[in-house]
């Protein structure tokens, strides 16, 4: 089973570069493998009989349960509101199905958190090798116009590597932490520059922006660490609260003509955000219900006429996590979501090792920015990408570094 896990750690970033949607299957299988490994180890170490349960019960009573609930009360409140919002969603059954799927994924993450591994060095090497392979695969596809992809598909577009680039951008921060912890500072810098260049020539603008800003965040977190937590928290929460207001006030047609004439995809996002902001005003407090974005009706008169093309004002999701949360869960859901953001930023700030704290901030911001520009917050592969990073942090950090997951 250990060899299987090592293989998956190598395959997830490398295979993910070529087929981004494979992340959903490989990471889910990875989590199940971890849980099974932990269960087998548990059985081997303990005598599985009545005496064991009698011995175990006094050590894990109601006080422990209340302690766990208290630690995750913010998550529970947000989850409860997501569930309640399913009941008044545009399509309640579909929303409940999506909610169940997301809940199961997060539960797998919660269970896998208790598992530890002995061969950490092999896991680190597998991850770094997987990242290097992903980088090589990108350049092969980029220079050969999709030689490998066209073996399985009829055509190739650089956009097909966007999900792989997004995964690479956040996974690289874990590798940077590993290299820093082993004293390979120059190697970590080289890795950052190589990935930054890769993302700059890719079609994934969101990943490039997230990774670039992540680098700036890393430097600031090291230079002004005494006030950095307050600075990043105020900036992130204030910006998130103001974003729906800004999206309402912008003139997407004018901005697109002036600044995004050569970026039709980015221009389309401005129209989407403006449309969503107007929809939020109709139901600002409660929203339209969990995962309801793709079911909100849009009439023919709402279609966007941009340079002779008809664009949909809300194709599947808002392409912005803050707008999606506000649209679906209302101001109440946004407030709970930002409470979670504050909690996770505080947990990162509690990390004592400077490089690890700075890289964790960078990874968090990287993930956050990509979500602010591109993907559906409830997409299976995107949720599992975040879980993948959390599991790697748990498995690969030094024993003296404590993370409250």
UniProtKB/Swiss-Prot annotation:
Location(s) in or outside the cell: Membrane
InterPro entries: O-antigen_ligase-rel_domated, WaaL-like
Pfam (any one): Wzy_C
Transmembrane segments: 23-43, 77-97, 120-140, 156-178, 201-221, 227-247, 270-290, 322-342, 353-375, 377-397
Keyword terms: Membrane, Transmembrane, Transmembrane helix
GO cellular component: membrane
Membrane topology: Multi-pass membrane protein
PANTHER family per the UniProt record, alphabetical: LIPOPOLYSACCHARIDE BIOSYNTHESIS PROTEIN PA4999-RELATED (PTHR37422:SF13), TEICHURONIC ACID BIOSYNTHESIS PROTEIN TUAE (PTHR37422)
Protein name (database record): Putative polysaccharide ligase RP358
Organism lineage: Bacteria, Pseudomonadati, Pseudomonadota, Alphaproteobacteria, Rickettsiales
């Amino acid at each position: 089973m250990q060899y299987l896990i090592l293989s998956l750690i190598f395959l997830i970033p490398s295979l993910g570069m070529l087929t981004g949607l494979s992340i959903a299957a490989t990471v889910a299988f990875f989590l199940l493998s971890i849980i099974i490994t932990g269960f087998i180890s548990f059985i081997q170490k303990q005598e599985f009989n009545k005496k064991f349960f009698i011995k175990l019960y006094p050590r894990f009573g109601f006080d422990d349960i209340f302690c766990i609930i208290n630690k995750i009360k913010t998550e529970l409140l947000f989850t409860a509101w997501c569930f309640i919002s399913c009941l008044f969603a545009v399509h309640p059954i579909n929303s409940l199905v999506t909610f169940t799927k997301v809940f199961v994924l997060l539960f797998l993450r919660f269970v896998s958190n208790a598992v530890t591994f002995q061969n950490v060095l092999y896991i680190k090497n597998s991850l770094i090798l997987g990242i290097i392979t992903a980088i090589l695969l990108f350049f092969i596809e980029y220079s050969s116009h999709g030689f490998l992809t066209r073996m399985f598909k009829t055509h190739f577009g650089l956009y097909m590597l966007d999900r792989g680039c997004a995964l690479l951008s956040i996974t690289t921060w874990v590798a940077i932490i590993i290299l820093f912890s082993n004293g390979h500072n120059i190697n970590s810098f080289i890795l950052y520059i190589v990935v930054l260049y890769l993302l700059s020539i890719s079609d994934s603008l969101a990943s490039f922006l997230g990774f670039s800003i992540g680098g700036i965040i890393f430097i600031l977190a090291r230079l002004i660490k005494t006030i950095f937590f307050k600075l990043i928290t105020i900036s992130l929460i204030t910006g998130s609260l103001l974003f729906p207001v800004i999206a309402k006030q912008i003139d997407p047609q004018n901005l697109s003509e002036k600044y995004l004439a050569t970026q039709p995809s980015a221009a389309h996002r401005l129209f989407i955000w403006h449309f969503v902001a107007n929809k939020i005003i109709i139901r600002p407090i409660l929203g339209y219900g969990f995962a309801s974005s793709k079911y909100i009706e849009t009439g023919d008169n709402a279609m966007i006429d941009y340079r002779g093309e008809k664009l949909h004002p809300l194709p599947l999701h808002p392409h912005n996590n803050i707008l999606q949360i506000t649209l679906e869960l209302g101001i109440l859901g946004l407030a709970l979501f930002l409470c979670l953001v504050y909690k996770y930023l505080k947990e990162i700030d509690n990390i004592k090792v400077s490089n690890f704290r700075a890289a964790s901030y960078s990874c968090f911001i990287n993930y956050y920015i990509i979500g602010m520009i591109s993907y559906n917050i409830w997409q299976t592969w995107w949720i599992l990408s975040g879980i993948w990073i959390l599991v790697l942090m748990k498995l690969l950090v030094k024993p003296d570094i404590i993370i409250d997951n």
